[in-house]
């Protein structure tokens, strides 16, 4: 979007991976679209449906708690965080965006586990809807690419 260059990588292969997805329900029409695009892309990358665990939580602030439980289970090669935070009239937007983003990053580092963060932060619903499909796909690709990389580095 907006001329950003994502770069390219070798063909991604997710056949051997187990992926956990945590979806926030808040702004559910957007997060449902994120989840659907993400799961379709995971399938296209070879991740079997039986190797995808998808759970829902109330909102973006609850996503890290579920991610942590998944990380501690040691069942997943990568995790994906899905959510949508739309700016309102109060400081709550910044609080939720900053705290959820920071927690997701901390978990990835603490557990040495790839976590693709697709918690959208937008000014309005139209911006979220414009990003919901591509960002869902991106999250799947990031998870599989990073799982492959960490597997290679181990």
Swiss-Prot record:
Active site: 92
GO cellular component terms, A-Z: cytosol; riboflavin synthase complex
Stored CDD domains: Lumazine_synthase-I
Its EC number(s): 2.5.1.78
GO terms of biological process kind: riboflavin biosynthetic process
Keyword set, alphabetical order: Riboflavin biosynthesis, Transferase
Top EC class for this record: transferase
Catalysed reactions, as listed in the record: (2S)-2-hydroxy-3-oxobutyl phosphate + 5-amino-6-(D-ribitylamino)uracil = 6,7-dimethyl-8-(1-D-ribityl)lumazine + phosphate + 2 H2O + H(+)
Signal sequence, renumbered to the chain: none
GO molecular function terms noted in the UniProt entry: 6,7-dimethyl-8-ribityllumazine synthase activity
Record Pfam families: DMRL_synthase
Pathway annotation: Cofactor biosynthesis; riboflavin biosynthesis; riboflavin from 2-hydroxy-3-oxobutyl phosphate and 5-amino-6-(D-ribitylamino)uracil: step 1/2
Record bears the keyword Transferase: yes
Assigned protein family: Belongs to the DMRL synthase family.
Classification via PANTHER family: 6,7-DIMETHYL-8-RIBITYLLUMAZINE SYNTHASE (PTHR21058:SF0), 6,7-DIMETHYL-8-RIBITYLLUMAZINE SYNTHASE DMRL SYNTHASE LUMAZINE SYNTHASE (PTHR21058)
NCBIfam families assigned: lumazine-synth
Function: Catalyzes the formation of 6,7-dimethyl-8-ribityllumazine by condensation of 5-amino-6-(D-ribitylamino)uracil with 3,4-dihydroxy-2-butanone 4-phosphate. This is the penultimate step in the biosynthesis of riboflavin.
The name this protein goes by in its record: 6,7-dimethyl-8-ribityllumazine synthase
Source organism phylogeny: Bacteria, Pseudomonadati, Pseudomonadota, Betaproteobacteria, Burkholderiales
